[in-house]
C-alpha cells in the first residue's frame, strides 16, 4: 500500500514537472538557428517581474542592466518586455534599425488617448501615421520657428515667449507683494500653456480659464497613468477594479478632447484660408486644398487628434523643465549667480534676451543640458514595439514585442559621465569655457530618437532657454533660510518634483 502511494506520488510529481516544463517551453518563442533570447531575471508565475520594478522602474531596470547588459528582457504579468539601455544600443535600435522598432504596443492606457487615434500614442506606424506626423511637424514649424514679417522678433515662438515671460514676471512679483512667496509650478504652467495656445489657437488660455486651465493643472493624472510599467497595462483585471486615478485619467482625456473639439469647430465656422493665423487654421487650410483629392483629406476628428499631439509636444515637457530648473537654481545659488553674471556681461540690462543670444551664453546652455541629464525627467520614452521579427546585438526579438527605452540609464551611465549623480553644468563646456562640448551634449537623451523622436524638440529647447534667460536676467530666486528643497523625482511619464510653496523672487534691478 505504501509502495503504491509512493509510486502514485512520484507519478503525480513527474506529471506536474512535465506540465510546468511544457508551459515554460511553450512560453518561450522558437528561436531561429544561431540566435538567442535576451537575458533577464527570473520572474514569479503570473506576476513576472512587476514586484522588481517597484515605484521607480527606471532605477530598478538600470540596476538590472548592470547585471544583464544593455539588451535584457523582463516579464510584467505574462507579457515579455524588452528593455534597452546604453546610448549605442538604443541608437542601433531606433535609428539604424528604426523601421523595426518604430511601432507602439497596444497598451490599455495608451488606447484611452483619443480612442487609439493619437499620432504619438497609437499603435499605427504606417503611411497614414507618417503623413500625419509630417503634417503636424510642418504646421508646428510654420507657427513657431518660422519668422513673422510684421514682428521685430526672430520668429513666432520668440514673440510669444517674450510676451508671456513679461506676464510671468509680473505675476511672480505680484505674489511676492501679496504673500511674500509662491509655488512657481502653476504660474509657469499658465505661461507655457499660453505660448502653445497662441500657436495652436491664436489666443491665450486666460481668455478661457474656466474651461482649460483647471484641466491643464490636473494633467498629473495623465503622466501617472501612461508611465512605463504601469500594472494597469499588463494585468487586464485591474481595468475592472475601482481605481480613482484611472477614472480621473479617463475624465481628463474626455474633457480635454471635448474642449479641443469646441475650439476646432469655432475655427471651422470662422475659417478664411486667405488669413491663416495659427496651427489649427493651417490644418483646416490643408483640408480645403486637398478636399478633392483621394488621399489628402483629414476628417475633423483627426485634426483634433493632431492638435492634441502638437499641444502635448509643446506643453508638459517645457513646463516640467522650467519648473525643475527653478528648483535647482534655488538649491544651487552659486550656479544661479554665475548664469546671471554671464547674462549681464553678454546682454546687459537694457534689453530682453533673444534666441540669437544662445551661442554667446554657453553656461546657460550647459545648465539646461545638465537639468535634462541630471533630472532625466522623461525616464523612458513612450513604449515602442517591434513591427516585425528582428535581431539586436545577436538577440532574437519577435514581432510586436513591447520595448522600454531607458533614457534615465543613458543619462546616468557612469562609463559616459564619470560622476553621473553630481550636478555640474560645466561638464558640458569646452576647456576654455566659451562653447558647448557638442559631442558630449549629443549624449543627453530626453526626447527619444529615430522615427518616433518628439516633433516638438527644437521648439521645447528654444522655449526653455528663452523663458529661463528672461527670468534670470530680471529676478533672483531663493528660498528662506531653513527651507530645504526636495529634488526627489516623482515617477511618471514625466517626473515632477515635490511642489515647493516657499520660493521667493527679488528684482535684480529696477526697470525705468
From Swiss-Prot:
It is a peripheral membrane protein. The keyword Mitochondrion does not apply. One of its GO terms (cellular component) is intracellular membrane-bounded organelle. InterPro entries: Cyt_P450, Cyt_P450_CS, Cyt_P450_E_grp-I, Cyt_P450_E_grp-I_CYP1, Cyt_P450_sf. Heme binds at residue 454. Substrate binds at residue 222. Constitutively expressed in liver. Coiled coil: none annotated. Glycans are attached at residue 65. Gene3D superfamilies: Cytochrome P450. Induction: By polychlorinated biphenyl (PCB) in liver and kidney. Belongs to the cytochrome P450 family. This is Cytochrome P450 1A2.
Amino acid at each position: 500500500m505504501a509502495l503504491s502511494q509512493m509510486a502514485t506520488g512520484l507519478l503525480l510529481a513527474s506529471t506536474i514537472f512535465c506540465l510546468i516544463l511544457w508551459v515554460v517551453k511553450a512560453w518561450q518563442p522558437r528561436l531561429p538557428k544561431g540566435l538567442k533570447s535576451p537575458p533577464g531575471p527570473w520572474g514569479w508565475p503570473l506576476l513576472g517581474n512587476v514586484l522588481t520594478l517597484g515605484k521607480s522602474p527606471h532605477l530598478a531596470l538600470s540596476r538590472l542592466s548592470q547585471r544583464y547588459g544593455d539588451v535584457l528582457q523582463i516579464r510584467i504579468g505574462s507579457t515579455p518586455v524588452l528593455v534597452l539601455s546604453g546610448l549605442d544600443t538604443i541608437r542601433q535600435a531606433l535609428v539604424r534599425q528604426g523601421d523595426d522598432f518604430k511601432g507602439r504596443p497596444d497598451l490599455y492606457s495608451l488606447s484611452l488617448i483619443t480612442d487609439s487615434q493619437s499620432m504619438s500614442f497609437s499603435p499605427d506606424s504606417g503611411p497614414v501615421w507618417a503623413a500625419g506626423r509630417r503634417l503636424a511637424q510642418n504646421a508646428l514649424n510654420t507657427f513657431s520657428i518660422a519668422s513673422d514679417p510684421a514682428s521685430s522678433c526672430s520668429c513666432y515662438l520668440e514673440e510669444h515667449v517674450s510676451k508671456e515671460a513679461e506676464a510671468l514676471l509680473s505675476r511672480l512679483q505680484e505674489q511676492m507683494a501679496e504673500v511674500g512667496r509662491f509655488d512657481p509650478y502653476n504660474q509657469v504652467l499658465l505661461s507655457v500653456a499660453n505660448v502653445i495656445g497662441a500657436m495652436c489657437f491664436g489666443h491665450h488660455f486666460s481668455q478661457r480659464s474656466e474651461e482649460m486651465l483647471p484641466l491643464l493643472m490636473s494633467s498629473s493624472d495623465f503622466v501617472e497613468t501612461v508611465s512605463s510599467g504601469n500594472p494597469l497595462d499588463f494585468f487586464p483585471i485591474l481595468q475592472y477594479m475601482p481605481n480613482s486615478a484611472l477614472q480621473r485619467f479617463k475624465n481628463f482625456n474626455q474633457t480635454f478632447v471635448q474642449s479641443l473639439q469646441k475650439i476646432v469647430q469655432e475655427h471651422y465656422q470662422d475659417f478664411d484660408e486667405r488669413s491663416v493665423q495659427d496651427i489649427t487654421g493651417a490644418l483646416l487650410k490643408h483640408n480645403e486644398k486637398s478636399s478633392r483629392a483621394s488621399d489628402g483629406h483629414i476628417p475633423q476628428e483627426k485634426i483634433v487628434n493632431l492638435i492634441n499631439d502638437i499641444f502635448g509636444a509643446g506643453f508638459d515637457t517645457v513646463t516640467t523643465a522650467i519648473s525643475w530648473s527653478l528648483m535647482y537654481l534655488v538649491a544651487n545659488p552659486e550656479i544661479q549667480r554665475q548664469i546671471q553674471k554671464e547674462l549681464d556681461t553678454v546682454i546687459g540690462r537694457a534689453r530682453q534676451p533673444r534666441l540669437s543670444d544662445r551661442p554667446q551664453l554657453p553656461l546657460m546652455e550647459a545648465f539646461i543640458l545638465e537639468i535634462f541629464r541630471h533630472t532625466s525627467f522623461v525616464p523612458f520614452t513612450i513604449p515602442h514595439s517591434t513591427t516585425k521579427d528582428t535581431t539586436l546585438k545577436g538577440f532574437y526579438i519577435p514581432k510586436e514585442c513591447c520595448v522600454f527605452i531607458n533614457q534615465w540609464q543613458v543619462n546616468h551611465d557612469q562609463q559616459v559621465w564619470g560622476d553621473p549623480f553630481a550636478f555640474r553644468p560645466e561638464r558640458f563646456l569646452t576647456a576654455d569655457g566659451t562653447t558647448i562640448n557638442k559631442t558630449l551634449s549629443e549624449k543627453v537623451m530626453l526626447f527619444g530618437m529615430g522615427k518616433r523622436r518628439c516633433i516638438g524638440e527644437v521648439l521645447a529647447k528654444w522655449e526653455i532657454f528663452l523663458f529661463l534667460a528672461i527670468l534670470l536676467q530680471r529676478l533672483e530666486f531663493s528660498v528662506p533660510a531653513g527651507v530645504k528643497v526636495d529634488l526627489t523625482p516623482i515617477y511618471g511619464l514625466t517626473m515632477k518634483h515635490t511642489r515647493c510653496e516657499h520660493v521667493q523672487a527679488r528684482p535684480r534691478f529696477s526697470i525705468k
